[in-house]
From Swiss-Prot:
The keyword Aminoacyl-tRNA synthetase does not apply. GO terms for biological process: translation. Keywords: Ribonucleoprotein, Ribosomal protein. HAMAP family: Ribosomal_uS2_A. The gene is rps2. One of its GO terms (molecular function) is structural constituent of ribosome. Residues 1-14 have a biased composition (Basic and acidic residues). Belongs to the universal ribosomal protein uS2 family. This is Small ribosomal subunit protein uS2. It comes from the Archaea. InterPro entries: Ribosomal_uS2 (IPR001865), Ribosomal_uS2_arc (IPR023454), Ribosomal_uS2_CS (IPR018130), Ribosomal_uS2_euk/arc (IPR005707), Ribosomal_uS2_flav_dom_sf (IPR023591). Residues 1-32 are annotated as: Disordered. One of its GO terms (cellular component) is small ribosomal subunit.
Amino acid sequence: MAEAKPAPEKEAAVKTESVPVADDEAASAKEGSTSLVSIDEYLAAGVHIGTQQKTQDMMRFVYRVRTDGLYVLDIQSTDERIRVASKLLSHYDPSRILVVSSRQYGQHPARMFSRALGTRAMLGRFIPGSLTNPQIHGFFEPDVIIVTDPAGDAQVLKEASSIGVPVIALCDTNNLTSNVDLVIPTNNKGRKALSLVYWLLAREVSRLNNTPFNYEMTDFETPL
């Protein structure tokens, strides 16, 4: 099983929607704990399904490795990090928040997140210099950034680091977390997983800010 070189996080998949869920994978959530949605909903969305590669950065979020070599993420950690990220985002002016996704299945959820909260979004191919060069069309210097995949959005992380803007990232088991300030451990490749995570983030930020939120999770799901 491949391991990538570790990089410290700055803070103090394979088929993802057709993989059967083992009963004991719900054990990663503490019995009797209150999660943002039911554990069954997290499992059904495949949020816990990682890849067959892992990095040292992400090992602390891994619940177990399956017999087929697939790493399974800890759902309780995912739930907790969504809460932490939502609380952090609620302290920012939405117009100063930037959500980024080059990954196909992340673009619609990110767009809906932006629409629900009134944030900025950069979707699809990221134009180098968009955060650092005022001469670039669409230049924007945000106060905080959310990225869908540190690998696919690597240029965004590089530019954010150069200008000192904090980054929240959806990270799978194969991701490195250098230049990431807050990791949300999740399947960041699956259509349903991405829609659920972005929907929960938008819902929780709205709740914390006492603003209306009239969206269902299916509104965030990329159409087939």
